[in-house]
Amino acid sequence: METHQTVSDLVRRYFATYESKDRNAIEALLSDDFTFSSPLDDHIDKTVYFKRCWPNSQTIRSFRIEKLFEKGNEAFVRYEGERYDGGKFRCTEFFRIEGNKIKEVEVYFASLLTHANEEKAAKAGIK
């Protein structure tokens, strides 16, 4: 990656595909040797990712990126997600980019956002 803007753009486009439910668009963003890791998944490949993770896109209404830090071909993003049932959650993800494609995503689960947690965050000045 030559510019930071390109890394940010790929990360934002990745989340936008979940909002639009556009599997073709996300497939175009991922490298052939893409891997995905989370507390539930250990370096699964693209085929397993689409079987196990992509169906979750049907439950996602939106993402709100709170922080996005990048350096070279890597980025960390913290976001709040909202499901169609109104539930909210917050996660952090690490992205590694190679050749204008997303090569690796590592998800670090955080908390489900409840009304009580949102009130605590507001009092602490966190939006």
Residue map of PLM features:
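Short, low-complexity N-terminal intrinsically disordered segments enriched in polar/charged residues
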Residues: 1-24, 28, 32, 116-127
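Intrinsically disordered, low-complexity segments enriched in small/polar residues
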Residues: 12-16, 32-34, 47, 77, ...
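A beta-strand edge to alpha-helix "cap/lid" segment located at domain peripheries
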Residues: 37-39, 50-127
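Acidic-and-aromatic substrate-binding clefts and catalytic sites of carbohydrate-active enzymes
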Residues: 42-44
